[in-house]
Amino acid sequence: MTDYELMGAALEEAARAAALGEVPVGAVVARNGEIIAAAHNTRETEKNALHHAELLAIDAACKKLGGWRLWQCELLVTLEPCPMCSGGIINSRIRRVVYGAADTKAGCCGSVTDLFALPFNHHPVVESGLRAEEAQALLQAFFLRLREQRAAKPRWKPPVTP
């Protein structure tokens, strides 16, 4: 599979996350163009702050390949990795990261900071912007829907005392 097709699989995972009420982020770990593992965010449904798509995909790939060193693998993810996920990428030795949309709030591949430029023992190649418009559209639609749901929900107001 090409990077474009692999990112398509990540976008499908992101759509699954959105359908569950999760922030729509999807990731795939691939080796030689073949998907080894795919995942999407499950932080809300699993009530676990660590359940980002990237970490879940890395975990599944490690289990499938029988080791923690994924130096022959690439990670394609719909949103620029956060600090936690960037740490997982470094520790698992992913050789290349391709992401779609930039994350101006928590992105660690250059948007907020670049963890991969720091003197760690591993530095993956990073490519950005692949199918970014599609990834951004999923995120924007999700957060618009979330804002609309919150606006429609009555808010508690304290009783007025005379």
Regions found by a protein language model. Name each.
Residues 25-33:
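Short beta-strand scaffold segments in enzyme catalytic cores
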Residues 36-43, 123:
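Short beta->alpha transition motifs characteristic of CBS
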Residues 67-80:
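Immediate flanking context of iron-sulfur cluster ligation sites
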Residues 21-25, 71:
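Short, basic and Ser/Thr-rich N-terminal targeting/leader segments
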Residues 43, 77, 101:
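Residues that line or immediately flank small-molecule/substrate-binding pockets and catalytic motifs
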Residues 10, 14-17, 27, 37, ...:
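Small-residue (primarily alanine) positions within well-ordered alpha-helices
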Residues 45-55:
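A short, polar/charged loop-to-alpha-helix boundary motif
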Residues 1-20, 84, 88-162:
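Zinc-dependent deaminase
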